[in-house]
């Protein structure tokens, strides 16, 4: 028995060595020792994967390798190699790794989890639909929804307290923008007034992100017989019960001569496409991507911005003064669609607010909403950063490390918006780069500008305990969120 055990240990050690040695000779990136079945996943601390990968980056450099279970994986950790891969060599890294959980969520018909040819078609249709609907709806929609949020917060200040956990309200604000943009509908801010099916969808979307971040059987194949995707399927079914009837109703009642929202334009584009690559059934999966991704990324960025500017009140005051300087401060904002347009900045005036734009960039750099990019598949042998990436390798962009790299950013853990006002601002890859850059990038940036300038002109945010800074260490799900904190909200005079 002991002899057999020694033979097994020797064979495993020999396989690991041969695997490592052959790849080293072929210019394969360095990395930690991979164990049978699990590869290098033992190096990743649950809930702190971004920090674990950052430690490996510090040890092995800007391009390193490890196995995710049975998948050969290369991690890209600095902006230059991420750009080199996804922008300069985009054709080699256009495809996705199609993990089992991705198929459960998107049925190979959504935006994020599809292969190149399907994705190109869906991206083209989305771009046309986004452009047509955006032109007609965007700024008015932002203003209308912000003022609903504004009145709710003011009501809370009068009737309850000037301290609050603001995260759920920011999520409602962000959700309402995407929901209204898609369906021309909104939801209330009070839990007790939200229809039960919508509230269940919101809860299910939060559960989805948690479950997707804890799916080891995606990579460790021996676990698949024991860890079914039952929970994930249940969550997706709950979300489908909310989305599908609304999409079906839009299809049934569509007025081709008077499209009113993004879904209307999307239906028209799909029907007019001669290739019929994208089916009407795909709309529910596209909507799921936009609702879940669009809600969490924007609300998380706003919450981080409140946290950082509460820890750096002098910057918040300078930001307030910049907004006041460029807008009319002799009038009071109203809460109707015909609000006083001179009181708040317009989207076309973005360039007049360099400090605000720098605060947004610094917030997204310091705490990127999605710290790890969705996995790509290398479709042909390609050299990146001086290393050979073999065909079939999984590629992951470590956006967290690339955004907090001391080679690119001086004092990267310090919140310093001024770094983006300098003559040669550093390069960022918050939304990744290349053809498969986040499709909601421009919409998210417009939301952050429109909401943020109004928010920080109307309210002052501060810490209830002046002697204690907010913790700037993040919690990782699929998105990077701050630890829950209570903020003090004061109405600006």
From Swiss-Prot:
One of its GO terms (biological process) is organic acid metabolic process. InterPro entries: Cyt_P450, Cyt_P450_CS, Cyt_P450_E_grp-I, Cyt_P450_sf. It is found in: Membrane. It is an enzyme of class 1 (oxidoreductase). It is a single-pass membrane protein. The keyword Thylakoid does not apply. Heme binds at residue 438. Belongs to the cytochrome P450 family. Its EC number is 1.14.-.-. Its cofactor is heme. This is Probable cytochrome P450 515B1. It comes from the Eukaryota. One of its GO terms (molecular function) is iron ion binding. It comes from Dictyostelium discoideum (Social amoeba). One of its GO terms (cellular component) is membrane. Keywords: Heme, Iron, Membrane, Metal-binding, Monooxygenase, Oxidoreductase, Transmembrane, Transmembrane helix. It holds the Pfam family p450. The chain crosses the membrane at residues 1-21.
């Amino acid at each position: 028995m002991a002899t057999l055990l020694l033979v097994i240990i020797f064979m495993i050690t020999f396989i690991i060595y041969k695997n490592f040695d052959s790849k080293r000779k072929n210019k394969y990136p360095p990395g930690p020792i991979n164990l049978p079945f699990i590869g290098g996943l033992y190096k990743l601390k649950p809930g702190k994967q971004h920090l674990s990968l950052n430690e490996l980056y510090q040890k092995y450099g800007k391009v390193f390798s490890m196995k995710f279970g049975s998948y050969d994986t290369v991690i890209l950790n600095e902006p230059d190699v991420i750009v080199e891969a996804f922008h300069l060599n985009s054709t080699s890294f256009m495809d996705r790794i199609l993990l089992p959980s991705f198929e459960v969520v998107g049925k190979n018909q959504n935006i994020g989890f599809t292969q190149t040819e399907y994705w190109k078609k869906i991206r083209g249709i989305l771009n046309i639909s986004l452009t047509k609907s955006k032109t007609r709806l965007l700024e008015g929609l932002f203003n209308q929804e912000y003022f609903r949020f504004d009145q709710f917060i003011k009501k809370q200040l009068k009737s309850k307290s000037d301290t609050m956990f603001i995260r759920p309200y920011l999520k409602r604000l962000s959700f309402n923008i995407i929901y209204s943009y898609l369906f021309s509908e909104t939801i209330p801010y009070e839990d007790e007034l939200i229809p039960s099916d919508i509230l269940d969808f919101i809860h299910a979307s939060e559960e989805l992100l948690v479950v997707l971040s804890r799916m080891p059987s995606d990579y460790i194949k021996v676990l698949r017989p024991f860890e079914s995707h039952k929970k994930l399927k249940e969550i997706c079914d709950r979300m489908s019960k909310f989305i599908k009837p609304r999409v079906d109703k839009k299809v049934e009642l569509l007025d081709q001569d008077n499209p009113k929202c993004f879904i209307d334009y999307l239906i028209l584009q799909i029907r007019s496409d001669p290739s019929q690559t994208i089916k009407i059934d795909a709309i529910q999966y596209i909507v799921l991507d936009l609702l879940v991704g669009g809600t969490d990324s924007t609300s998380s960025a706003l919450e981080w911005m409140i946290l950082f500017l509460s820890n750096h009140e002098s910057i918040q005051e300078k930001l307030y003064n910049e907004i006041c300087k460029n807008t009319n401060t002799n009038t009071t904002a109203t809460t109707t669609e015909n609000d006083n347009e001179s009181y708040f900045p317009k989207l076309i005036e973005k360039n007049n607010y360099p400090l605000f734009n720098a605060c947004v960039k610094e917030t997204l750099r310091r705490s990127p909403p999605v710290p790890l990019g969705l996995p790509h598949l290398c479709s042909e042998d390609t050299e990146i950063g001086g290393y050979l990436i073999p065909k079939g390798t999984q590629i992951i962009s470590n956006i967290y490390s690339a955004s907090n790299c001391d080679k690119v950013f001086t004092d990267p853990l310090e919140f310093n918006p001024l770094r983006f006002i300098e003559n040669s601002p550093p390069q960022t890859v918050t939304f990744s780069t290349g053809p498969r850059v986040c499709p909601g990038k421009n919409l998210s940036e417009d939301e952050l500008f429109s909401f943020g300038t109004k928010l920080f002109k109307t309210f002052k945010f501060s810490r209830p305990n002046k002697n204690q800074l907010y913790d700037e260490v993040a919690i990782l799900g699929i998105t990077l969120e701050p630890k829950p904190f209570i903020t003090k909200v004061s109405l600006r005079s």
